[in-house]
Amino acid sequence: MISRIFKCKRLFVFFFLASSTAVIIALTLFTLQSFRRFYETWFVSVFSEGKINATHYLVGFLHYWGSITVVLAGATGFDRSRPVGKDFTFSLSFLEIVGIVLFAYAWINQYKTAIILANLRKDSSGNVVTVQHKIAHGGLFKYLSSPHLTCEILIYISLWLILFNNYMFQYVLLWVVSNQVETALLNHWWYLKRFKNYPKERKAVLPFVI
């Protein structure tokens, strides 16, 4: 009986816990994303006069705390069936490579989007001259109203691919997709209502589709 329980536990470790490589990569990418967002907030973005709801602000903190907790909870180092670090290896799988490439694409384009949005409120010298909303052009704005939200979804899809064996992370992905899609749709409808000359070919979330 005990041996069966142990075997089941080892199967759980194999199928439902991410490898040490996957966890290190995911935490590194989370760190890169956090530092870039911090830089954008303080040195790139030009915010409007609107204020964020305190509840939304708290949810943002809880999201990052919860996401990191899920990554660590699904790491092999939290399994007591073997000594921590005994089986540590660093070898990239196909899904991890795909995830890294997708993350890089989304990460770079999300930053480009932030720059485009900030420049809408600056003059040629870089001075802020307005906080009004304008129609953005260039980059992924050719296809989407809020490409930074689509990039956010792609970033979490990339992390899900990297942490594929961590079954808990799929719930983080579903949470991100649901709230980002909702926000993207609301933004898109607002732009269509606000600007009569808004480009009709732009979509909310997925180019050419929706």
Where would I find each of the regions flagged by the language model?
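Hydrophobic transmembrane alpha-helices
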Residues: 63, 77, 85-210
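Membrane-helix and juxtamembrane interface regions of eukaryotic multi-pass membrane proteins
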Residues: 1-64, 210
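Membrane-helix exit/interface motif
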Residues: 4, 38-47, 66-81, 113-116
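Helix-coil boundary and interhelical linker segments in multi-pass alpha-helical membrane proteins
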Residues: 3-28, 68-98, 161-171
